[in-house]
Amino acid sequence: MKITFLGTGAAIPTKYRAHPSISLKFDGEIFLFDCGENTQRQIIFTDVSPMKINNIFITHLHGDHVLGLPGLLQSIAFQGRKKPLNIYGPAETVKMIEHILGVGYHSIDYPINVHEISSKTPERIIFTNNYEVFSYPVVHSVPALAYVFKQVKKPRMDLEKVKKLGIEIGPDLKRLKDGFNVELNGEIITLNDVTLPPKKGICVGYSGDTIPLKEFAEFLKELKCNTLIHEATFDKTMERNAKETLHSTATDALNIAKLSGVSTVLLTHISARYDNLNAFENEIVEFKAENPEIHVLIAEDLMEYSLK
């Protein structure tokens, strides 16, 4: 699994930080979280294939998180896309996509399925054999969501148990692997009888724009998340601004990481007011002095982070 930060800025882009967008590559598929202006151009400088984007997750409908959609949707149409594209987002996402498709002379021939999430509670929005995705309602100036991507690990076959039960490699073992029970010497054998608990999979949370939420941290902990991408629009001296605009400071994000039990936190959505990251780095040093076990990084545009 690999995370690529396409844009790590906030409301106003800078020379060094584009509007928010994050790519997550898993099992040959690309999952895109937010799509700020310039996303499709940022992709050019990475190994992200826009044609492999099947799911786009929008945290909220502020322009800095969605204005890259019109260009991206049309560009992949020009490249010959035919397979459906799923777009997930909060209330009014359907209307926004309708407006995008109604402006200009678009030639989009592939299906776009829009999934509007209005739930005020956490929701599992995708479930497959290999991964699941959850939405979590957060607090911002407009309806907003956080997302969690979780790898699904299957139980591991315990060959010692298989041997002990006298199951030979063949049809019976295949049926067990497929989830069916097998009768052997008058005894019913189930998959649980011959497997070990699955290993812990990779789990990544993305806060979107939000105030620090203890409840979100608890949700991440419940899902056993090991990586958190959290907005850090301001440094802690701007705490008042963060509260007024319903954003988070770097210290807020770090504290949420600690509460959630993750091993890594990646800070993003940095305000254009900062010419350097000294204030953020000082907060990280203070935090690491008491929490050395947590890996902290400030994301930069086009930065890649691999997870195993």
UniProtKB/Swiss-Prot annotation:
Pfam families linked: Lactamase_B
Which residues are involved in binding Zn(2+) 2? D64, H65, D209, H269
Q: Which domain of life is it from?
A: Archaea
* Positions annotated to bind Zn(2+) 1: H60, H62, H140, D209
Task: Please give the catalytic activity noted in the UniProt record.
Answer: Endonucleolytic cleavage of RNA, removing extra 3' nucleotides from tRNA precursor, generating 3' termini of tRNAs. A 3'-hydroxy group is left at the tRNA terminus and a 5'-phosphoryl group is left at the trailer molecule
- Enzyme's top EC category: hydrolase
Catalytic residues, chain numbering: D64 (proton acceptor)
An example of a GO molecular function for this protein is:
zinc ion binding
Instruction: Report the cofactor remark.
Output: Binds 2 Zn(2+) ions.
Q: Which cofactor does it need?
A: Zn(2+)
Q: What is its EC number?
A: 3.1.26.11
Which keywords does the record carry? Endonuclease, Hydrolase, Metal-binding, Nuclease, tRNA processing, Zinc
Q: State the Gene3D superfamilies in the record.
A: Ribonuclease Z/Hydroxyacylglutathione hydrolase-like
The family database entries (PANTHER family) matched by this protein are listed as:
ZINC PHOSPHODIESTERASE ELAC PROTEIN 1
Q: Which NCBIfam families match?
A: PRK00055.1-3, RNase_Z
The UniProt family comment states:
Belongs to the RNase Z family.
Q: What does this protein do?
A: Zinc phosphodiesterase, which displays some tRNA 3'-processing endonuclease activity. Probably involved in tRNA maturation, by removing a 3'-trailer from precursor tRNA.
Q: Its quaternary structure?
A: Homodimer.
This chain's protein is named Ribonuclease Z
